[in-house]
């Protein structure tokens, strides 16, 4: 099911998602009618922070946090901006990034020894996904909430 299929049809005509979530990823997605807002949030030059909760298999490199903080380069030469990794347990962590490249979180985790088994975006800028919000549900927020 597509995201916009979940919303009332009278709203869908003017709305579009800001960024994207992969099919196997869940979590926070901003939907707007404001193109400037969309550009601001998705532009790498804005350095908007996005935080993910990750469950993974494998053993992270001893230097995983340091490597993330310095930025990574994959085998194809793709550069990833510095990110912040917070270990929660031996199989879960939080990762905060400031860009949104294709499968970026999965690719970065792979570079430090982890294979992502579950991925959930929990924060964009100052907007935090309410824990009690069910999949497919939504809340309204103001532009002020994002820009503050």
Walk through the language-model features, giving the residues of each.
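Basic, flexible Lys/Arg- and Gly-enriched helix-loop patches that mediate nucleic-acid binding at interfaces
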Residues: 1-148
């Amino acid at each position: 099911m597509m995201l916009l299929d979940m919303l009332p049809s009278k709203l869908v005509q003017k709305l579009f998602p800001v960024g994207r979530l992969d099919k196997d990823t869940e979590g926070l997605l901003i939907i707007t009618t404001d193109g400037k807002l969309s550009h601001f949030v998705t532009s790498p030059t804005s350095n908007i922070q996005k935080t993910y909760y990750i469950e993974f298999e494998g053993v992270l490199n001893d230097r995983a946090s340091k490597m993330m903080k310095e930025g990574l380069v994959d085998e194809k030469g793709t550069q990833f901006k510095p990110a912040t990794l917070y270990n929660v347990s031996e199989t879960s962590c939080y990762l905060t990034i400031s860009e949104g490249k294709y499968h970026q979180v999965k690719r970065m985790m792979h570079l430090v020894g982890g294979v992502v088994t579950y991925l959930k975006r929990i924060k964009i800028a100052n907007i935090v996904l309410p824990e009690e919000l069910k999949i497919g549900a939504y809340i309204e927020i103001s532009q002020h909430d994002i820009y503050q």
